[in-house]
Regions:
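Conserved phosphotransfer microenvironments
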Residues: 19, 38-69, 73-80
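Short amphipathic alpha-helical segments
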Residues: 22-24, 59-62, 82-84, 102
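Active-site-adjacent beta-strand anchor residues
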Residues: 11-12, 49-50, 90
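Output/docking surface of receiver
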Residues: 34-35, 73-114
Length: 114
C-alpha cells in the first residue's frame, strides 16, 4: 500500500465545513470531498467522516465496515459522549489543531500498514 504522504483521503462532508477545517490542519496527504458515504470507494485507503452534532451510528458502521474511518465531529455538546462506535479514531473541533493532525496522521499510518 502507498505511504500516507502519497494517498488522497476522501472526506465525507455534505456541508463542506469539516473539509475547510481539515485544510487548515495541514495534513501530510491530499484530501478530496465527497457528499455521501456511498461515494467512498471500497479500495480507499482511509476515510474521514464529518459529523454535525451527534454522529449517525449506522453511517459510521457502514463506512467503517468498508474502509478505516475517523469521525470528525463539529458542534458537539460537551455533555454528549464521543460516539466512537466502530471508527478508528474520533476528533472534534474542540481539540487543538496539532492534536487533530496527530490523531488523523497516526490513524492513516496504522491503516496503511500491512
Amino acid at each position: 500500500m502507498a505511504t500516507a504522504q502519497t494517498v488522497a483521503i476522501p472526506v465525507v462532508d455534505p456541508y463542506g465545513s469539516v473539509f475547510r477545517l481539515l485544510r487548515s490542519v495541514e495534513l501530510p496527504f491530499s484530501l478530496f470531498r465527497v457528499e455521501d458515504a456511498s461515494e467512498v470507494e471500497a479500495d480507499a485507503p482511509f476515510a474521514i467522516l464529518s459529523s454535525y452534532g451527534k454522529a449517525d451510528a449506522a453511517v459510521v458502521e457502514e463506512l467503517s465496515d468498508r474502509v478505516p474511518t475517523v469521525v470528525y465531529a463539529v458542534q458537539v455538546r460537551a455533555n454528549e459522549p464521543a460516539p466512537l462506535m466502530r471508527a478508528m479514531a474520533y476528533v472534534s473541533d474542540r481539540m487543538p489543531v496539532g492534536l487533530i493532525r496527530d490523531v488523523i496522521t497516526a490513524a492513516v499510518e496504522r491503516a496503511s500498514k500491512p
